[in-house]
Structure formats: C-alpha cells, structure tokens
C-alpha cells in the first residue's frame, strides 16, 4: 500500500510538472503579442546584443548551415527515436508501466519545447513589439502629388540602370556577382552596420555569418530564398540561383533579422536603404531595383487616375540589361515550379510562413513583406531630396 501511495504521489508530481510546463509554453508563446512595447524597446536597446552574443558566436564558428544540419540529422533521429519509442511503449504496456513511461517522455519533450520557445522569444519574438524602422527614421506619412511620386520613381530608375552598367554579365547578357558567397556575406554584414550607425538605428553590431544552404535546389520549391533561425541566430540563404536583382537584398534582409529586427517589412526597408547607400554596384542595383519594382505599378496607376502620360521605362535602351535579368529570374522560378509536386510544396511553404507570421501578431501574414510604397517616398523626401545623388 505504501509503495502504491508513493507511486501515485510521484505520478501526481509528474502530472503537475507537465501542467506547469504547458502553462509556461502557452505564456511564452504569447510574448510576441502581449509584451509591452516599452519593454521590448529596452530589451533591444540594452540587452539583445549581449543575449544573442553566445548563440551567434557559436554559429559563426561554422561555415555550413547548422539549421540545415539539424533539420536533416534531426529528421533521421526523429524517425529512429519514434521506432524506439513505439517498441518501448509496447513493452511497457505489456508490463503495465506505460503510463509513467509516457509521462516521462512527455516531460522531456515539453522541456525541449519550452527551451526553444524561450530562445525564439529572446532572439526574435520580442522584436515584433519594438518600434518600426519607419519610426526610428522619424518619417511622417505625407500627401504627395503624382509629380512627386514620379520624381522618386525616376530617382530609383536612374540609380538602378546606372548601377547595372557596372555589373559583369555572362554570355547571355545576364548579370552575375563578382564575389564569393563568403565575401558577399561579410560585405552585407558590414553594410548593415554602417547604415544603422548612419541613421542611428539600434541594431546589434555583432558579426553575423550568413550560411549557404546545400539543399537549396529543393528548398526553392517552397519559394523561400532566405530564412532566419532564431535558435542559432543564423541567416540561411538559398544559393541555388544567385539572382543579381535580389541576392544582396536577401542577404541584408536576413542579417537584419539576426541583428534584432523581427518584422519582414522592416527588414526589407532597412535592406533597401542599406543597398542604395552601398558603394558597390551589385548592392546598389538590387536596392534600387527593389524600390523601382515596388513603386512602378503604384505610380503607373496614379498616372492613369490623374490622366498623366506615364514614361514607358521598359522601352528605354538602358532598361534592356535589367529586363534580361528579370527574364532569367522568371525562367528559373518557372522551371522550379513546373511540376504539380513543386507547386504543392510552394503552396505549403507559403501557407506555413503565413500562419507563422500571423501567430506572431503580423496580421497581414506574408503580405507584411511588402513595404508600403509611400514609405520610400517619405524616406526620399526626408533624407535624399536635393542631395547630389538624388
């Protein structure tokens, strides 16, 4: 009787411990939505750089993606452990000790989940509650005329085609990077640091070693070109096709996540600003290209509404190499998504990302990657109008 009572108490304590862990998991899962903005701001201004130092430093020791290694090796281990678990569970059922065994396994699994959620909150989740880059820059939404919108579009077009003239081409006339992946990763990191200091943006100054993903070709089926892993503070980059129109932006975007920015549109705004401030033609090209292609449909529609004549940019001679780059990029993605399976995987990847963003308070889901077009106009009017390079 005494042994049975002790056993019941032991099981009771295990159940209580499990319930406590479940409670903490729920609470920490709500952090990105509930933590006061002032707390998030204090954390990122004063603590994030120190808290992220250890995992970032560990990740920087490796040139290969730790995230990819864990996904591949972890997937294999999960299959093996699942088989072991089922065999042991059957044995325990026969010996009538299955209940305690299941509770023990559940306890360890919940401990791992809790640790991962805490790491997620510290390295990314809290960042959803801090100020936006737009606010840090002190920008204000203005009411702009068609001519002012066109002025910004012209500025981005001129910057784009000017930078494109200085980029090397392959035999098809398609632009390509002149640097190795590692050299690009180092340059992008220093570029984000430089621009964040210039505009007094509170980002971590830590070195972030971006990682190429070996299985990039298969990863492309999801339509994802970059991913930040908050557990390792690791920027993972798809290298199956080094798209000259977007590769520098992708690098800068993922590095921005690792340096403390959580929102997707913040990372895109910061990345585009960093790229146009670069002295390197490849980065300038990608930054101006991103802004031009974002503004183009908006300004064109504005012209139609106002009855204005909209410039036919795509007929300009300087636009020809840009069009070749665009067509090469489209051809790659058309080939990747040419099968039913790849399109299905793409839809799954997009919906998973959509749910992830919404669960972290980003109501627009994947639409939050889009930077509102007027933010580029606000930035130009505030910082660049009248400048020598504007």
Language model region names:
Residues 2, 7-11, 85-111:
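Cytoplasmic juxtamembrane regions at transmembrane-helix boundaries
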């Amino acid at each position: 009787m005494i042994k049975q009572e002790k056993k019941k108490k032991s099981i009771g304590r295990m159940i209580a411990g499990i319930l406590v862990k479940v409670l903490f998991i729920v609470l920490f899962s709500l952090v990105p939505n509930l933590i006061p903005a002032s707390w998030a701001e204090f954390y990122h201004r004063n603590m994030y750089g120190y808290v992220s130092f250890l995992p970032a430093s560990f990740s920087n020791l490796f040139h290969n993606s730790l995230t990819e290694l864990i996904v591949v090796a972890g997937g294999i281990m999960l299959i093996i452990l699942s088989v072991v678990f089922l065999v042991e569970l059957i044995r325990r059922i026969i010996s009538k000790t299955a209940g305690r065994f299941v509770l023990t396994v559940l306890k360890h699994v919940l401990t791992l989940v809790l640790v991962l959620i805490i790491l997620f909150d510290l390295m990314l989740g809290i960042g959803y509650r801090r100020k936006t880059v737009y606010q840090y820059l002190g920008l204000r939404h203005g009411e702009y005329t068609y001519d002012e919108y066109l002025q910004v579009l012209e500025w981005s077009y001129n910057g784009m085609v000017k930078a494109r003239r200085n980029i090397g081409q392959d035999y098809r006339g398609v632009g390509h990077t002149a640097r190795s992946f590692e050299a690009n990763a180092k340059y992008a990191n220093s570029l984000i640091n430089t621009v964040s200091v210039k505009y007094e943006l509170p980002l971590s100054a830590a070195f972030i070693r971006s990682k190429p993903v070996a299985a990039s070709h298969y990863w492309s089926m999801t339509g994802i070109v970059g991913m930040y892993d908050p557990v390792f503070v690791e920027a993972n980059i798809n290298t199956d096709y080094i798209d000259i129109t977007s590769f520098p932006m992708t690098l800068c975007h993922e590095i921005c996540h690792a340096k403390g920015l959580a929102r997707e549109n913040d990372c895109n705004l910061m990345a585009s600003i960093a790229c146009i401030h670069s002295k390197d033609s490849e980065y300038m090209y990608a930054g101006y290209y991103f802004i031009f292609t974002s503004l183009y449909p908006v300004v064109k529609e504005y012209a139609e509404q106002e009855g204005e004549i909209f410039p036919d940019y795509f007929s300009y001679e300087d636009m020809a190499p840009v069009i070749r780059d665009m067509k090469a990029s489209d051809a790659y993605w058309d080939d990747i998504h040419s099968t039913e399976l790849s399109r299905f995987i793409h839809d799954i990847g997009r919906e998973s990302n959509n749910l992830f963003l919404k669960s972290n308070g980003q109501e627009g889901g994947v639409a939050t990657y889009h930077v509102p077009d007027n933010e580029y106009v606000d930035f130009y009017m505030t910082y660049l109008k009248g400048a020598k390079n504007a």
